[in-house]
Amino acid sequence: MTSPFNRPAGRAAVLAPEGWRAAAGWCAVVLLLTLALTAVTGCSPPSPGLAVRVDGNRLVNAQGEQVRLLGADRSGAEYACVQRLGILAGPADRRSVAAMTSWGIDSVRLPLNEDCWLGINGVPARFGGARYRAAIRAYVTELNSAGVYVILDLHWNAPGRLLATGQQPMADLDHAPAFWASVASAFRANPAVVFDLYNEPHGISWQCWRNGCVLPQGWNAAGMQTLVNAVRATGARQPVIASGLGSGNDLSSWLRYKPYDAAGQLVAGFHVYNFLPCASVACWDQAVAPVARHVPVVATELGEVRCADAFIDTFMNWADQAGVSYLGWAWNPAGCGAPSLISSWDGRPTAYGMGLRAHLMAMGRPGT
């Protein structure tokens, strides 16, 4: 999702999901994979007692008890670094995390920028590379310490020497495998982290989604199988999320084309907004429920743009019955039509955010 607070440089802000860019060849990929694996020094330690893994079509904790990831997206790290605004574009301290947990949030999705993580394509050193990675690791540690699971999401990317200033139809073969090799190496010892392989695939076939292809724009897309392989080659065994086509809103052929994961930790990602095609109980029953009978489904982005909560209320009630996880877009202060859950970093909800907060609190989420 692109919002007024994370607009691509040189582009007007849009409300609908976005993504619109000559392959460097396998030698470049191999080189970047090598650099990525050595670029991160040390691994983020696991948080005591906080863990999540796939068990059949459920997510479970370290004790084998079923859990659902219920929370919010924290936008910022995907855009601030390339727009020279900083790294996280907002507070990342204990107080700001406490504002989240006061809602009953137990999961936060953190969108990332591959160029900033890898420190390539002209990203300023003060915002990218080692400093960016250190800031992300520190924020993950802060969230985990508060009992919050973290989903790390490849959100902004670009092929070749282009700077990653927005989303694309799919992950790029030039840098995305290196990105995931590096991220997975950094967090492979942390069982409270989940990897969201690519934010919003769109405008491609299901074959390309799984296996990669040459896009009309002239560069090579990396398929979900390549991204799964990049993560597993590091020894990381955390759950991996593969979001559907149609900007994550289409799971119609997900089961047929799902990538193979030797670790058995595959999760289906779903994006649901009131302006996307699959936005009714009938569609969720037809397209999402069948997937949820086989693998866990996480709605990694949930929102509506009418400064209201009727739509998300309908989805959350459906998801509670179906065992589907969900995270609201987004925990950033802006107008409720962005959509934005909060009007200030202290957790004051917008008219739209009141719906998510009330629902989590009514469920008796920890921290409420």
Model-derived regions: residue spans:
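N-terminal carbohydrate-binding accessory modules
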Residues: 43-107, 126
